[in-house]
Amino acid sequence: MDYQPNTSLRLSLPSYKNHQLNLELVLEPSSMSSSSSSSTNSSSCLEQPRVFSCNYCQRKFYSSQALGGHQNAHKLERTLAKKSRELFRSSNTVDSDQPYPFSGRFELYGRGYQGFLESGGSRDFSARRVPESGLDQDQEKSHLDLSLRL
């Protein structure tokens, strides 16, 4: 039997249950005689198209490629759901009394203000960790410079 490419496009309207338009491109074998080709066409029309079913939602597809693309969408959904669960789990496991890394405030307090330097002060700048609640009231008042200079 001689196989020469003979493509045909089968179109069918969607039924009321299945709202998908069936556009199936089929490569059918053709033979030398027209009578045998007509018999192969009639037998291929009687054959049921192969149906591929999704394991997750039971949706039906007429090609394995379409099913593969559809299952990739399910894979993406599962990946996003997993990441969301992991993020939620990690945020719940952090102890509320423990600060997050790098959440403490670090501030520079220098004794090198211009007025202080003019009066003979040193340029010693020190970094110290400030508690989350801020400075004590007495410490805050002692570091506050209210002088105005032009």
Curated annotation (Swiss-Prot):
Summary of the tissues where the protein is detected: Highly expressed at in the abscission zone (AZ) of petals, stamens, sepals and siliques. Expressed at lower levels in stamens, carpels, cotyledons, major veins of rosette leaves, trichomes of inflorescence leaves and stems.
Main location: nucleus
Compartment(s): Nucleus
Gene Ontology molecular-function annotations: DNA-binding transcription factor activity; zinc ion binding
Entry-linked InterPro entries: ZFP3-like, Znf_C2H2_sf, Znf_C2H2_type
Example GO biological process: regulation of DNA-templated transcription
Chain ranges of zinc fingers (C2H2-type): 52-74
Tagged with keyword Zinc: yes
GO cellular component: nucleus
Signal sequence region: none
Coiled coil: none
Region of interest (Disordered), ranges: 120-146
Keywords annotated in UniProt: Metal-binding, Nucleus, Zinc, Zinc-finger
SUPFAM superfamilies per record: beta-beta-alpha zinc fingers (SSF57667)
Its job: Probable transcription factor involved in the regulation of floral organ abscission. Participates in processes that directly or indirectly influence shedding of floral organs.
Subunit structure of this chain's protein: Interacts with DOF4.7.
PANTHER family from the UniProt entry: C2H2 AND C2HC ZINC FINGERS SUPERFAMILY PROTEIN, ZINC FINGER PROTEIN 3-LIKE
Other remarks in the entry: Plants over-expressing ZFP2 fail in the abscission of floral organs (sepals, petals and stamens) after anthesis.
Record protein name field: Zinc finger protein 2
Organism taxonomic ancestry: Eukaryota, Viridiplantae, Streptophyta, Embryophyta, Tracheophyta
